[in-house]
Curated annotation (Swiss-Prot):
GO terms for biological process: fungal-type cell wall organization. It is found in: Secreted, Cell wall; Membrane. It comes from the Eukaryota. Glycans are attached at residue 22. Residues 1-18 form the signal peptide. A lipid is attached at residue 194 (GPI-anchor amidated glycine). This is Cell wall protein PGA62. Residues 173-194 have a biased composition (Low complexity). Its main location: secreted. Residues 195-213 form a propeptide. The gene is PGA62. Residues 145-172 have a biased composition (Polar residues). Induction: Induced during cell well regeneration, by fluconazole, and in high iron conditions. Expression is also induced by TBF1 and repressed by SSK1, and CYR1 or RAS1. Disruption phenotype: Leads to an altered cell wall structure with a less electron dense inner layer of the cell wall, and a disorganized outer layer.
């Protein structure tokens, strides 16, 4: 009798435990929960999408919020196809401030239903460098001096030719044969020698004239 009563008690306890056991719902739905966070006397609300789990115990229903069973929280993602925007950066130094417009990329990070926008440099866009200039474009044209002939650079020959008609053919012949300044020196010397030869009879004539007086 005692054995049978023990069996009945264990059966009743087992049925009671079965009636009060927690059940896990696998087909859960989603809902939006507002979370309020406070820091340094400042509070802000954030909406988070989460799952709803219902636990039934007799006629009382408890609802708890938990993450989705197979859905992980989305990690911050960086978009590869970024667009560009212009951001104004203000720099101050020695009580002087100036603004600079900088073109930068826009990356959108989505977490739940909140969208955070951060500014970051463009991934791999570089400004094209200036094209190298050729030597012909940057170097000025060099002017070469025009060679001058002996007849143009030595006017002394013409003077010698005009002053001494007897020696007129000699300087012209030398000027026609040579076009360099080195060969013109003898022509000038020849003209001077001719002038000196003419000066001897003139001096002799002056002495003879002086002897008459």
């Amino acid at each position: 009798m005692q054995f049978s009563s023990a069996v009945v008690l264990s059966a009743v306890a087992g049925s009671a435990l079965a009636a009060y056991s927690n059940s896990t719902v696998t087909d859960i739905q989603t809902t939006v929960v507002t979370i309020t966070s406070c820091e340094e006397n400042k509070c802000h609300e954030t909406e988070v999408t989460t799952g709803v789990t219902t636990v039934t115990e007799v006629d009382t229903t408890y609802t708890t919020y938990c993450p989705l069973s197979t859905t992980e929280a989305p990690a911050p993602s960086t978009a590869t196809d970024v667009s560009t925007t212009v951001v104004t950066i203000t720099s101050c130094e020695e009580d002087k401030c100036h603004e600079t417009a900088v073109t930068t990329g826009v990356t959108t990070v989505t977490e739940g239903t909140t969208i955070y926008t951060t500014y970051c440099p463009l991934p791999s866009t570089e400004a094209p460098g200036p094209a190298p200039s050729t030597a012909e474009e940057s170097k000025p044209a060099e002017s070469s001096p025009v060679p001058t002939t002996a007849a143009e650079s030595s006017p002394a020959k013409t003077t010698a030719a005009e002053s001494s008609p007897a020696q007129e053919t000699t300087p012209k012949t030398v000027a026609a044969e040579s076009s360099s300044a080195e060969t013109t020196a003898p022509a000038v010397s020849t003209a001077e020698a001719g002038a000196a030869a003419n000066a001897v009879p003139v001096a002799a004539g002056l002495l003879a004239l002086a002897a008459l007086f």
